[in-house]
Structure formats: structure tokens, C-alpha cells
Regions:
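Extended, Lys/Glu-rich alpha-helical coiled-coil stalks
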Residues: 29-31, 140-180
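Extreme N-terminal "head/tail" segments of very large remodeling/mechanoenzyme assemblies
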Residues: 1-115, 128
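Alpha-helical scaffold elements adjacent to nucleotide-binding pockets in ATP/GTP-utilizing enzyme cores
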Residues: 41-44, 102, 121, 125, ...
């Protein structure tokens, strides 16, 4: 189970500063008027996990668009736990220069690992820790961007099937049945 623990956001989209501690149990509701930052808050979590804007695959958004207007940099730090592992993901965007990332993985009862700072290595490790749920799978299933509720429905059959298999963990099940 993935449990969000803490989120810090600075100069991301329309969010100036957020320091949010999530409850250990229960449901979380983001409520507010239009343009209050609810979607930006969710996109900051998505960005922390995958390092891309939600709309990046559609050519609608670049990474610089995530930096608050008038600011030169944005940062997002997300702490989450997955089983006995805790991940601390920090991503910083420098307008016009791309992003830097640091991933710290802490395993219960194990010595602390060295932080991972290479973008590709970090992204792959996060996807692995998330049970192979990549950005496309999350975006097509349960993390729907505004005005894209029909996204899963409009995918070609084979892509829809692949997305659902990843989401439900059926690929792992198929591999296990082949092994035994």
C-alpha cells in the first residue's frame, strides 16, 4: 500500500508555499473554489513521482510551465511509504535549465542507502517501488487530469488492456504462473 506522508511545494504552478502532512489513516479531501490550487496540488504529487507535467504527452505543457509565474525555480518534496520502504523524492526545476532530482530510499531495519541523483535511475527506481505503475498507467486509470475523463475509454483496445493489466498487477501474476 502506498501512503502519502508529507508534501512540500514551493513556486509550483500557482502554489507559492505548501507544507502538508497527510494523516496516517483515513481519506483525504481537497476542497476549495475554482482556481484555488486543488489540481496544482495533485499535479505536484504526480510531478514528484514521475518528473513530468501531467499534460506533457499531449504537447500542451513543458517542465518550465510548472514554475510559478515570476519565479525562476520550483521545488516539490514528497515523502511516502510503500510497505516497509520510505521514499523521499525531491525535484527542483530551474527555469530554462531542466530539473534536478534526489531520491532517498529507506528500508526498515536496513542501513541507509546512498541518495540517487541521476534522473533516469531515479525515475526507474520510483516506478519499481510503485509496483511498475508508470506515469501513463496512473494517468489513464485513477489520476485523471481535468477535462480528460474519457482518456481510458478512448485508448485503443490493446493499450487499454495493457494499462489495466499494469494497474491490477496482472503482469506479475502472469509471470508467476509461467514460473510455476
Amino acid at each position: 500500500m502506498i501512503i502519502l506522508k508529507h508534501l512540500t511545494v514551493e513556486h509550483f504552478r500557482l502554489l507559492r508555499e505548501i507544507d502538508l502532512h497527510f494523516p496516517q489513516r483515513g481519506s483525504i479531501l481537497f476542497q476549495g473554489p475554482n482556481e484555488a490550487g486543488k489540481s496544482a496540488l495533485l499535479e505536484s504529487i504526480y510531478f514528484a513521482l514521475y518528473g513530468t507535467p501531467i499534460a506533457s504527452d499531449h504537447g500542451k505543457s513543458s517542465i518550465d510551465d510548472l514554475v510559478l509565474y515570476g519565479s525562476s525555480r520550483a521545488s516539490v518534496t514528497l515523502t511516502l511509504s510503500i510497505g516497509a520502504n520510505e521514499l523521499i523524492i525531491n525535484r527542483v526545476i530551474e527555469r530554462g535549465k531542466g530539473q534536478q532530482v534526489t531520491l532517498q530510499v529507506r528500508k526498515l531495519g536496513m542501513p541507509e542507502e546512498e541518495p540517487i541523483t541521476r534522473l533516469g535511475t531515479t525515475n526507474e527506481r520510483i516506478i519499481t517501488e510503485l509496483g511498475r505503475v508508470d506515469a501513463e498507467t496512473l494517468r489513464n486509470s485513477c489520476f485523471i487530469e481535468q477535462k480528460s475523463l474519457n482518456r481510458l475509454e478512448n485508448l485503443p483496445g490493446s493499450e487499454r488492456e495493457t494499462t489495466l493489466r499494469k494497474l491490477l498487477g496482472l503482469e506479475k501474476l502472469l509471470r508467476l504462473t509461467e514460473q510455476f
